[in-house]
Amino acid sequence: MRHYEIVFMVHPDQSEQVPAMVERYTGLVTENGGTVHRLEDWGRRHLAYPINKIHKAHYVLMNIECSGETLDEIENIFRFNDAIIRSLVVRCKEAITEASPMMKPAEEKPRRREEKSERPRTERNEEAPADAEAN
């Protein structure tokens, strides 16, 4: 059996059905002898660009270990389920169980503005002309 990371986006009008969908997919994996190593519900998030005139979606991440037949069945369900806007399946070398960067608390995530302000202003100004000369 192989390890897979699956992310799928659910139509925002169907957000209340997400727990039932997740239960169905995890049940399908475990019934066929697989395991679910990580399951994260990222909630409703704004999309980078509209998909079919939809600006928000409910995100779910799953890390599973299953056979190819089970994965084909899951992908087939995703393809014919109108509530699922997009899905992505990536094969992994090993099981990933730690929390994803999306689920880490805010204090653990580095802030870009704070990092930028820590550098001296003169250092930032010196880099700009060097970049301009390179072009």
Curated annotation (Swiss-Prot):
GO terms for molecular function: small ribosomal subunit rRNA binding; structural constituent of ribosome. Pfam families: Ribosomal_S6 (PF01250). InterPro entries: Ribosomal_bS6, Ribosomal_bS6_CS, Ribosomal_bS6_sf, Ribosomal_S6_plastid/chlpt, Transl_elong_EF1B/ribsomal_bS6. Residues 105-127 have a biased composition (Basic and acidic residues). The keyword RNA-binding applies. Keywords: Ribonucleoprotein, Ribosomal protein, RNA-binding, rRNA-binding. It comes from the Bacteria. GO terms for biological process: translation. Coiled coil: none annotated. Belongs to the bacterial ribosomal protein bS6 family. Binds together with bS18 to 16S ribosomal RNA. HAMAP family: Ribosomal_bS6. NCBIfam families: S6. This is Small ribosomal subunit protein bS6. It comes from Chromohalobacter salexigens (strain ATCC BAA-138 / DSM 3043 / CIP 106854 / NCIMB 13768 / 1H11).
